């Protein structure tokens, strides 16, 4: 990647690398400050300290950080946790991910639901991983991303769940349920 800190601010590559390592250690390594936790089943999650749970946003952002910093082992552990505990494998939400779980992997809430930014960042980080690491390791990252896209774009609304992207407006639907989909309520929409 280009070092924009150097190009625009004159910060050396060595200074940039040192700062990135400090940030990585703060959030992924240091026992007192980290939000990245490994589980006994070769998975890992990102803990949301404000809500005391695990959210698709945090998981997918964590995966994006890992792929950007070339941390494949951590990336794979986060992806493994998300697939194992957050993915809906049956029912009308099949192919979507529960937007929040307990750190033990229990989905929270009575009714299944998702938050679209989680799926979007899962897809994006998996495509990035495909280009960085290839598709011959533990995961075919490209195939994983394509599967999510297929799953979240195959909902016709007949069971109350719609496509992640509104096919008319081309906008991301905040929650792909009828009320949000039909009102074109998107993730960046203002909240009253």
Spans of features found by a protein language model:
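Extended ligand-binding groove/face enriched in aromatic
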Residues: 84-184
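Extended, hydrophobic/aromatic-rich amphipathic alpha-helical segments that build helical scaffolds
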Residues: 57-70, 119-129
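Conserved small/polar residues in nucleotide/adenosyl-binding loops
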Residues: 185-190
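Low-complexity, Ser/Thr/Pro/Gly-enriched N-terminal "stalk/linker" regions
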Residues: 1-57, 68-109, 159-164
């Amino acid at each position: 990647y280009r070092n924009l800190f150097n190009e625009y601010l004159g910060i050396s590559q060595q200074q940039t690398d040192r700062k990135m390592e400090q940030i990585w250690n703060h959030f992924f390594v240091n026992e007192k400050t980290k939000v990245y936790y490994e589980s006994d089943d070769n998975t890992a999650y990102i803990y949301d300290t404000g809500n005391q749970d695990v959210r698709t946003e945090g998981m997918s952002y964590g995966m994006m950080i890992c792929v950007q910093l070339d941390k494949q082992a951590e990336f794979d552990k986060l992806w493994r946790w998300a697939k194992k505990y957050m993915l809906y494998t049956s029912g009308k939400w099949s192919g979507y991910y529960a937007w929040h779980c307990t750190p033990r992997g229990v989905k929270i809430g009575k009714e299944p639901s998702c938050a679209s930014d989680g799926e979007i960042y899962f897809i994006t980080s998996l495509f990035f991983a495909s280009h960085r690491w290839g598709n011959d390791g533990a995961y075919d990252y490209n195939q994983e991303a394509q599967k999510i896209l297929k799953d979240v774009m195959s909902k016709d609304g007949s069971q109350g769940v719609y496509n992640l992207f509104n096919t008319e407006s081309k906008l991301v639907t905040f929650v792909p349920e009828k009320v949000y989909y039909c009102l074109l309520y998107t993730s960046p929409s203002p909240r009253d």
